């Protein structure tokens, strides 16, 4: 955990100095768990409750910082499905847990695609079977949470890097092909 904290410190580019220890993080996590546990006990409800949490505008704005919404909506449904595991893992990580209905809404909001539950739920079940997600069954829904954040990002990052590399290679080939086409057009024009 200390290595992870050190990596986080390096990634944060701020002028302010931050100091915290593993015990500080443990205290925060314990306090957060106890406050949720106490609130649950005070309700006197024996079955676990889950409150839907829509993807925040801040999270959507983060993505809009890279691509505007209209561009995200031009991404083909089959491309969204091809990257669905990575998309689901990242959305669940952003939310700190989600049910399938919320994830379907998030995908619709981000990509403008209307995937069926029959497409999304098998991916969620597979990710849970692979140990990437913890699944909690409640009365009317299943809630999915990232089981190991570090392992998740170690899985997602190479997949994203492969996709970016593939896209860059295609873009470079397209630019080269277009340049050759223009050169051929000029040569033919000069010969006339």
UniProtKB/Swiss-Prot annotation:
Reported induction: Transcribed from mid-log to stationary phase, probably as a gvpD-gvpM RNA. Highly expressed in 25% salt, poorly expressed in 15% salt, no gas vesicles are formed at 15% salt at 15% salt. Accumulates in late exponential to stationary phase (at protein level).
Keywords: Activator, Cytoplasm, DNA-binding, Transcription, Transcription regulation
UniProt entry tagged with the keyword Cytoplasm: yes
Regulation affecting activity: The amount of protein that accumulates is controlled by GvpD; GvpD causes a reduction in the amount of GvpE, preventing accumulation of excessive amounts of gas vesicles.
Residue positions binding DNA: 140-145
GO cellular component, one term: cytoplasm
Gene3D superfamilies to which the protein is assigned, alphabetical: Winged helix-like DNA-binding domain superfamily/Winged helix DNA-binding domain
Keyword Ribosomal protein: no
Subunit structure: Interacts with GvpD, also with c-GvpD from H.salinarum.
Full protein name: Transcriptional activator GvpE
Organism this protein belongs to: Haloferax mediterranei (strain ATCC 33500 / DSM 1411 / JCM 8866 / NBRC 14739 / NCIMB 2177 / R-4) (Halobacterium mediterranei)
Lineage of the species this protein comes from: Archaea, Methanobacteriati, Methanobacteriota, Stenosarchaea group, Halobacteria
Encoding gene per record: gvpE
